[in-house]
């Protein structure tokens, strides 16, 4: 489901959220005449997980500011190709190719490039003895938030996200599709933690929200026997 419509016939997350708010009584049809709730944090197409929706003018403004100022801590979970032994923070420069709807990651800045930082921590591994089949499950902290950042950044260091049609390896993607019915990149927006907040968002101050892993992710974990060696970033 897209956060916003790409085509008139699409059903968007915005519409889903509005429908939920109407059914729950948190919003009326009359309210929609002056304001329509909207998603504050967008995910890449076919990335699962948490999105935040502002259901009032003030709430949307404050939420959008928190995400814009990068004071909301955002954590993702992913399964990547290869073995990653230790966590680290990687940096680079992202350049968009609008014609191809892809990005490139460079070591040095060029005109129109955007600096990016991505922090990852290994959570578990799987290996069948063939190094070409190794998998690592990672926790990702998105320090900067650019379109395709996590997927392209990890691919640029030789650890593509499993199932990724843009930045992944086709032969391995075919394997995950055949064995586990994976039809997308295995990237999940797992957790967000809010900073100290005031005003209309005071009730969110310091709170953490988690989204359960989707079925395709769990099928790969179970089928490949990925062994978890530590917990995700602890909830407050």
What does each model-identified segment do?
Residues 110-111, 128-133, 143, 153-236:
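Pseudouridine synthases involved in rRNA/tRNA modification
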Residues 52, 78, 120, 150, ...:
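Residue-level signal for inorganic ion chemistry
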Residues 138-141:
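Short histidine-centered loop motifs in beta-beta connectors
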Residues 63, 146-154:
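Short beta-strand segments enriched for Tyr within beta-sheet-rich domains
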Residues 1-100, 109-114, 124-127, 131, ...:
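RNA pseudouridine synthases
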Residues 57, 143-144:
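Loop/turn elements at beta-strand to alpha-helix junctions within RNA-recognition modules
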Residues 72-76, 86, 90, 116-118, ...:
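A generic structural signal for short beta-strands and their flanking turns/coil linkers
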